[in-house]
């Protein structure tokens, strides 16, 4: 136990975790900006390659499947840019609680940024692996972003849990107030339910929730404002998707009950939908600003087409996520995973690399071979002597 003087506290007592988590907000934004820069460079490089590389006497950009990748790269880079601009604006405004938003931005940027760079590699083919074309470094570096600053699997669960906290509390409150409790006798149950039924504050929450959960009646669409008039059809589509997400989130929570806490596939679908809705909102905002500013030219036309294409793709993704809440392959997935795990357990640990932190097999795995990896002389540190060493003296050479 470490005693910290009051004068050295960074915040109020008991708020240490909140301070630590808040620091992650900045890291997730700077990480996302790095992804965006690499994705934009990859987009432009691959698109230029597709225009100048010919196959069958035609540029690659003439082919549908290449055009699909070009459009997707443009759409995702525009969406990442829009989301990051909105996110950094929240930081500059000193908004107090934006952990969900920064987590969503990190997940979206790392997933879609990776897709952009992967598409660029596919367009450039084997040339993409050539160091001189400056894409292979971006391809290698981009993969780590889905792991660092919170692995995306963890972030999906975080967005689900933290973002859905208010809904969960509301549903639990209504259930406690109006549902039958087996721990109470019948008279206590009736008395509690009648008393709460006469409470306007409780019924104002219980009736709309009951209409959705019991009668499956969807609520009204939310009102979206501030967009450019030309984008009203897209704002209406976004409002409908927000309503559908809220409705099916409630139904999924009722269907899975307490099991939803451990079913990460369901959590990921709900989180991914919320993240795409956030991205669509950011895209709508950015495109509205461009239209109001009277931006023109080929770059704007590219941005406008990319934004509208992203809306189409995001809508398809959201509808698929909603459909998969009820019809999916989760059961066979768990069975297949269990069978694969059971088989792997029969294989000797000595044939495989095992985590040094494994509580069950540390030290039993295959030894790592490092002869082919360049090592610094002098062990783990590069010894520079008196500071007057020549280049030859500090040249990195592989071990014999």
Describe each PLM feature range:
Residues 3-387, 391-400:
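Flavin-dependent oxidoreductase catalytic core characteristic
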């Amino acid at each position: 136990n470490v005693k910290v003087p009051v004068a050295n506290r960074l915040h109020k007592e008991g708020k240490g975790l909140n301070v630590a988590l808040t620091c992650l907000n900045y890291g997730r934004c700077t990480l996302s900006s790095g992804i965006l820069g690499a994705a934009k460079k990859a987009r432009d490089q691959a698109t230029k390659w597709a225009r100048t590389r010919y196959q069958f006497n035609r540029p690659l950009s003439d082919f549908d499947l290449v055009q699909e990748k070009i459009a997707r790269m443009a759409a995702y880079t525009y969406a990442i840019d829009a989301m990051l601009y909105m996110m950094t604006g929240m930081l500059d405004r000193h908004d107090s609680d934006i952990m969900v938003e920064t987590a969503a931005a990190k997940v979206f940027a790392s997933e879609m940024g990776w897709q952009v760079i992967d598409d660029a590699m596919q367009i450039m083919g084997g040339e993409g692996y050539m160091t001189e074309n400056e894409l292979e470094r971006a391809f290698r570096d981009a993969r780590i972003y889905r792991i660092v600053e919170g692995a995306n699997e963890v972030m999906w669960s975080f967005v689900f849990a933290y973002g859905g906290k208010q809904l969960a509390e509301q549903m639990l409150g209504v259930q406690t107030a109006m549902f039958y409790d087996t721990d109470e006798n019948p008279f206590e149950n009736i008395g509690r339910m009648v008393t709460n039924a006469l409470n306007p504050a409780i019924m104002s929450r219980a009736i709309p929730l009951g209409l959705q959960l019991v009668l499956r009646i969807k609520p009204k669409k939310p009102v979206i404002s501030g967009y450019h008039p030309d984008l009203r059809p897209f704002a209406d589509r976004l409002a409908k998707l927000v309503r559908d997400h809220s409705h099916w989130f409630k139904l999924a929570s009722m269907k899975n009950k307490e099991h939803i806490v451990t079913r990460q596939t369901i959590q990921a679908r709900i989180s991914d939908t919320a993240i795409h809705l956030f991205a669509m909102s950011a895209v709508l905002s950015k495109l509205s600003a461009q239209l109001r500013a009277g931006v023109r030219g080929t770059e704007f036309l590219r941005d406008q087409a990319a934004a509208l294409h992203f809306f189409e793709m995001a809508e398809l993704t959201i509808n698929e996520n909603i459909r998969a809440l009820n019809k999916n392959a989760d059961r066979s997935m768990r069975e297949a995973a269990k069978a694969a795990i059971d088989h792997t357990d029969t294989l000797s640990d000595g044939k495989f690399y095992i985590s040094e932190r494994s509580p069950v097999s540390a030290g039993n795995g295959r030894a790592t071979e490092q002869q082919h990896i360049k090592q610094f002389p002098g062990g783990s540190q590069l010894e520079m002597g008196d500071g007057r060493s020549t280049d030859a003296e500090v040249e990195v050479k592989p071990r014999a």
